[in-house]
Amino acid sequence: MESAFLKDNTDVYDITFQTEKSVKIKIEVDTQPPLKFKTEQKLLLLPQSFMTRCFTLPTLFAGKMHALVYRAWKNRVKGRDWYDFEWYVRHNIPLDFTHLSERALQFNQEEFDKETFLQKLNERLAAADINQVKADVLPFVRNPKELDIWSNDYFLQLAKMIRFE
């Protein structure tokens, strides 16, 4: 994984930032990404019309689930992983299990079937400090009331709704 930073005085394709605060954008490029992913062509219209190749939503869901299960931040959690997990399930996006398995093998030297993955996920969901999860994501949520339903049980029930591709 290679990292670089764009600062507020960096010109990239004539992009500049007009803000009072200093803006930094971290860009990471995975030079050896896990394989068995799926892509699709998408048309974007701004700043001008162009076609781009991107990961499919099921493949992105696999990356998010890998992060949710394996991300190690000592005692901290990343609330955005939980928010995104809810988003994928809410939008009925199937999970690309083949890519998830490839990620676990490459980064964690683990092989598992769907049942074992769901067990690992449920353990993570049950053990998390949900107040810490909420506190981490709160600054990014427009309506804090959305988080009132969040509980360990809520996420365990979401896990039962995962569809596999």
Q: Positions of the model-derived regions?
A:
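Structured mid-to-C-terminal alpha-helical surface segments
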Residues: 1-165
